[in-house]
Structures are given as structure tokens and as C-alpha cells.
Amino acid sequence: ANLYDNIAQNELTKYRWGFARKKAQLALTTIIPVDDEYSSVYQLPSDLLALTTIRPNGNYQLYGDKVHTNFNGALTADYQFNTPESEWPAYFAKMMEYALAKDFATSIRDSSSSRQEMSSEYAIASRMARFTDSQQHPQTAIAHQPFIEVRR
């Protein structure tokens, strides 16, 4: 991957962007685990950048692009995916401009003050992008309440 792709993928995984989320049912593979710690192996999606959640909740371990678990049923993953530029909202695209400017400022202008200026602009654009993105998605209520349940 080139430097641009690395910066874009890094920015896509820094925050749980709503436009970059996916949910997928994982495919059970025919791979037999090496030891008896896990009984099943599932394939992760090819466009996955960062895994958020595996459902149903349970004991699992990631090995490369596979999920090893003792669960043997329908397994779903919530994850951040490698979103094409054409699907980026304007607020994220603008933030990416500043991320690129920050990373390339020194080599283009040979000026540390230029890098500091772009870093400052990036920080502002990043805050605004996260705020805008968060306004588009409802808050998820906490389903598990161990401190309340222990008192019952």
C-alpha cells in the first residue's frame, strides 16, 4: 500500500465513523483449529479495517483474517471497513485534506511552522468531523448493568 492509502486507512480506524461501519454474517470455514482451545474458525470480511464487535458475545481470538471461537452458529461482526473515497461525506474528506497536508507539509514546503499550522487545522477539522458524524447516529443504551444486577 502507498502512503496515501495508509493515511486514509489510519483515519478511517481512528474513530468509529458511522459511514464506515458495516455488519456482516461471518462464514464458517472448514479449517480445523490446531489445538483444542477453539472448535470453530470463521472468515473475517475482506474489507475489514478494524473489528468492533462479534455477536453473540463469547470467547474468541483473532488470528490473521480468521476468528477462532467455540461458538458454532450464526456469528456476526460489526466493523470499520475500507470505505471508498466516493462514499466519504464532505466532513471526512475535508479532514483528510488536512491530514494529508499535515503529513506532507514538511516535505513540500520544508517548513516546520507549516507542519504546525496544518496540524492545528487538522485537529480542528477532526473535532468538527467527529461531532458532525456523531449527530447522525443515535446513542446506544448500555444493555448490561452489572452494578445494578449484583444488588438484586
Regions found by a protein language model. Give the residues of each.
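Glycine-enriched, solvent-exposed interface loops adjoining structured elements
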Residues: A1-R152
